[in-house]
């Protein structure tokens, strides 16, 4: 199933282990969803066009983060589109803005 999701929807996490770890840590924040649903939501945020309710911040190295104002979802992504993390921050948009303003190393 994971392989099918990966092929059908583009990159996921860098490894199955990373997906498992992030789902275990953050999956409950999204209610009663499966690991596949968690992955799909992270991919949908990554693939949504920025603008309107979808905020985006890009770093010089190509990494980027997104925040969905409608649902409070935050995602951070590598340059190649693989998912770094996906969760619902306690401080919502403030968290996104704070991350976006952090200096690039």
Model-derived features: where do they sit?
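Short alpha-helical interface elements
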Residues: 44-48, 63-67, 91, 101-102
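Aromatic side chains
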Residues: 13, 22-23, 38, 67, ...
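Compact soluble domain cores
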Residues: 7-62
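Basic/aromatic recognition patch in beta-strand/loop cores that engages polyanionic ligands
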Residues: 56-79
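A short, surface-exposed interaction/processing loop segment used at functional sites
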Residues: 75-105
């Amino acid at each position: 199933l994971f392989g099918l999701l990966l092929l059908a929807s583009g990159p996921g996490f860098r490894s199955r282990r990373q997906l498992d770890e992030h789902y275990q840590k953050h999956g409950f924040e999204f209610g009663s969803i499966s690991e596949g649903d968690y992955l799909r939501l992270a991919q949908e945020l990554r693939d949504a066009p920025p603008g309107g309710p979808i905020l985006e911040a890009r770093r010089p190295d190509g990494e980027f983060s997104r925040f969905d104002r409608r649902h409070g979802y935050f995602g951070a992504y590598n340059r190649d589109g693989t998912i770094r993390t996906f969760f619902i921050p306690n401080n919502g948009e403030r968290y996104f803005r704070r991350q976006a303003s952090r200096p690039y190393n």
